[in-house]
Amino acid sequence: MLIVNSIFKYYLSCFLGLSSAVLLAQEFDVVQIQSAYYPKQFIEESGAEGEIGFFEWGVQVAIPQAIKSSKDSIILIHRMSYGNLKVDAEANPTAGPMVDAEKYYHNISYNLGLVYSLKSTWHVVVNLTPTIASDFEEKLRGDDLLFQASTLIVKSKNKSWKYGLGLAYNTRFGRQLFIPMGLLKYETKRVALDMVLPNKLNLMFKASNNKIHYGLKAGLNGTVINNSTEIQSISNVIDEVGYSRLIVGPAITLRLKNAFNLNLQGGLAVARRLEFIDVNNNIIDRTPQASPFFAIGISFAPNLMRIESGLND
């Protein structure tokens, strides 16, 4: 209890006097641990036989840094993240018998997020994210390094409504692409709409005691990962893996004591992609069919840490 109070006081001191740069959007996750399970499904490609399932888990820690001069108010968010993707496949690389194969991929990133106040109602939200994405089965190379970035310009119309437009360069579709972004937020004491397209669309309702939030969530995420060793279920020599999924389903957040939240979601994983690119740039499609999923996570989110959602995706 003493440790939690000390942490809370530190974050509060970072944000006192910066109300012009803090956009009342959503609670900011200082610490987040999450996992998701996707059972095996048949491969969609007609020429391939087998099933593929996934298990994801990750952790992130964010540290705020407040900067204020006589003219400008700036909030920096330093976030370190680790993600782990397990690919569990049963397939035949040739015309022979089925082969069971597990492969683990890792994603380590540092995200520098910035909220800069142009005027009292206009803000610029910037994210810069150098990333290491690899199977870590050989020494790191230049191919293991990625760079992702996004910029949003956000208008706060009033305490409830916010909207914005921007551009991102990221791997959410399983490939490195430039992607236009749109933001729309509406929040009252009983309902919260949080839309950052194409990243997420959340519609959550709040119980009268504010201890339970429930509703629907949709989220798109993906990565491009360097592959350095043999994949037993594929005969080609694979150089790179592209993975993405869109999850849609009901969600519930239980607000626990001392600013901790328990987050649960289930539903369907759709619009999935699993592509293996070999050394000759041929694409081997092993995308599985739509699948149910279940996700669970825990987060630490003090009430006063309410930062623009473009920094908290």
Stretches with model-predicted labels:
Residues F55-V61, H106-L112, L128-I132, L145-T151, ...:
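Hydrophobic, lipid-facing positions within transmembrane beta-strands of outer-membrane proteins
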Residues K68-K71, T121-V124, K159-G164, V191-L193, ...:
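Repeated loop/turn-to-beta-strand initiation elements of outer-membrane beta-barrel proteins
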Residues V61-I67, Y116, K155, Y186-T188, ...:
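Residue-level signature of outer-membrane beta-barrel architecture
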Residues D29-I33, D72-M80, V124-L128, Y163-L167, ...:
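Transmembrane beta-strands of outer-membrane beta-barrel proteins
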Residues G182-K185, P288-D313:
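Outer-membrane beta-barrel "beta-signal"
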Residues G83-P97, P198-F294:
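Outer-membrane beta-barrel translocator/channel fold
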Residues S35-Q41, M80-D88, P130-F136, Y169-F173, ...:
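Transmembrane beta-strands of outer-membrane beta-barrel pores
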Residues Q26-V87, V196, N303:
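Short glycine/proline- and aromatic-enriched beta-strand/turn motifs that initiate or cap beta-hairpins
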